[in-house]
C-alpha cells in the first residue's frame, strides 16, 4: 500500500481533467501531474528508501507534485510550516535527519545561512532538471506500515516534535474523512486557504482519491476575498480553515458563494458565538474536527447536520467519536475514569 496509488487511480479515470490550479489557472491535468510526480520520484531515489525529504514553502502548486513524488520514491514527506522562524526550521530539519529541503525562493534565502541540510529552490533550474528525469515506475510493494509523513507539532517543551504517520495511517484518515465529512467527486475542488504543511495538506489524499481539483490561491496565503472569489469560480468547493480564518470570512460581509459546499474548521477553539455568526452568514456548510498530530483529522467531530438546531453544549464541544475510532478517558492505571481529575484521554483506531 502506497498513497501514490490514489493519484495513480485518479489519473487512470480522469486523466484529461484539471487536477491542480494556481488561482484560476490550470497547472496540471491528472495525467500530467502523475507523470511529473514520477519524474521527480526517479530523481529522488538517489536518497534511498525512507529518506526524509522536507518542504518549506508558502502554499504553491508544486507542493502537490512533491508530496506524491516523495511517496512514489518511497521516501518520507516532511513539510515545514512556512511561518516558523528559520532557526525553528533548522531544528526540525536536524531532528528529522532530512536529506534535502525544497523551499520557495524567499524561504531558501533566509534558511541558507543556518541550514545544515542541502537546499533546492522549487521551480529553479535544478528542480526543473529533476522533473525532466525518466519517470520512475509506480510503487507496488510498499509496506503499509512504512512512514509516509513526518508531522511536526509545536510540542510541550518549546521544541517541535515529529509524529510519524504511515501509509496505513493516512489511508485510514482518508477513508474516515470520506465516510464522515464530505463526498467529493471529479466535479469538486479543495481550496488550499490554510497552510498545506498541516491540515489543508493532509486533506490532499482524500480529495485526490475522488478526482477533486487542488486549488492553490495565487497569493500563496489566506486572503478572505480571494478565497471567496475562488469559491465562485471553481465547482463544489471544500476547504480546511482555522477558526480565525472563518471569522475573517464573516467579516467580509459577503454572501456564501454558490459553489461553497464544505468548510472543515479545527486547529484551535471555535467559540459558540463565533460559530453561530458564521452559520448565519454562510449557512449549513460547517464541519468540525478534532485531531492531533498522531491521529490527524481523525478523533472526533461534528458533521454538517450535527450543527443544525444544536444546543450550545454540542456546538461548543469537540463532537462525537469518528467512524472506526474509540475515545475513552482513563485513569493513571489505564482503567476507565469518571472524574476529569488526574485523567488522560486515550484514542484507538484501526491504524
Question: Could you tell me what each predicted segment is?
Answer:
Residues 6-29:
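AMP-dependent adenylate-forming
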Residues 15-16, 134-152, 159, 183-189, ...:
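Conserved pre-ATP/AMP-binding loop-to-beta segment of ANL
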Residues 17, 31-54, 84-86, 90, ...:
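ANL superfamily AMP-binding
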Residues 26, 41-84:
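Conserved AMP-binding/adenylate-forming
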Residues 33-39, 144, 163-185, 193, ...:
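Conserved structural elements of the adenylate-forming
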Residues 106-145, 159:
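ANL superfamily adenylate-forming
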Residues 171-189, 199-237, 252:
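Conserved AMP-binding/adenylation subdomain of ANL enzymes
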Residues 212, 236-240, 250-312, 326, ...:
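Gly/Ser/Thr-rich phosphate-binding loop
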Amino acid at each position: 500500500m502506497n498513497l501514490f496509488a490514489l493519484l495513480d487511480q485518479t489519473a487512470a479515470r480522469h486523466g484529461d481533467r484539471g487536477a491542480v490550479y494556481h488561482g484560476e489557472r490550470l497547472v496540471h491535468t491528472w495525467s500530467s501531474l502523475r507523470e511529473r510526480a514520477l519524474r521527480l520520484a526517479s530523481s529522488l531515489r538517489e536518497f534511498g528508501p525512507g529518506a526524509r525529504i522536507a518542504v518549506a514553502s508558502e502554499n504553491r502548486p508544486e507542493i502537490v507534485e512533491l508530496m506524491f513524488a516523495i511517496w512514489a520514491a518511497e521516501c518520507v514527506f516532511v513539510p515545514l510550516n512556512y511561518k516558523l522562524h528559520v532557526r525553528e526550521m533548522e531544528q526540525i530539519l536536524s531532528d528529522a535527519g532530512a536529506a534535502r529541503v525544497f523551499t520557495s525562493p524567499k524561504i531558501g534565502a533566509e534558511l541558507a545561512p543556518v541550514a545544515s541540510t542541502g537546499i533546492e529552490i522549487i521551480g529553479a533550474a535544478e528542480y526543473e532538471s529533476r522533473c525532466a528525469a525518466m519517470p520512475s515506475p509506480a510503487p507496488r510493494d510498499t509496506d503499509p506500515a512504512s512512514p509516509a509523513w513526518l508531522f511536526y507539532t509545536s510540542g510541550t517543551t518549546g521544541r517541535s516534535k515529529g509524529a510519524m504517520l504511515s501509509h496505513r495511517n493516512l489511508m485510514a484518515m482518508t477513508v474516515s474523512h470520506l465516510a464522515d465529512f464530505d463526498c467529493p467527486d471529479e466535479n469538486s475542488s479543495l481550496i488550499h486557504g490554510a497552510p498545506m504543511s498541516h491540515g489543508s495538506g493532509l486533506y490532499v489524499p482524500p480529495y485526490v482519491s475522488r478526482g477533486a481539483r487542488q486549488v492553490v490561491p495565487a497569493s500563496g496565503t489566506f486572503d478572505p476575498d480571494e478565497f471567496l472569489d475562488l469559491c465562485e469560480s471553481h465547482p463544489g468547493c471544500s476547504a480546511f480553515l482555522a477558526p480565525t480564518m472563518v471569522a475573517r470570512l464573516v467579516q467580509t460581509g459577503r454572501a456564501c458563494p454558490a459553489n461553497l459546499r464544505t468548510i472543515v474548521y479545527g486547529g484551535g477553539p471555535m467559540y459558540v458565538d463565533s460559530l453561530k455568526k458564521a452559520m448565519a452568514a454562510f449557512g449549513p456548510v460547517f464541519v468540525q474536527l478534532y485531531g492531533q498530530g498522531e491521529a490527524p483529522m481523525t478523533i472526533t467531530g461534528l458533521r454538517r447536520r450535527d450543527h443544525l438546531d444544536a444546543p450550545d453544549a454540542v456546538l461548543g464541544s469537540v463532537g462525537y467519536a469518528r467512524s472506526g475510532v474509540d475515545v475513552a478517558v482513563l485513569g493513571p492505571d489505564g482503567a476507565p475514569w469518571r472524574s476529569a481529575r488526574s485523567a488522560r484521554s486515550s484514542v484507538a483506531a484501526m491504524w
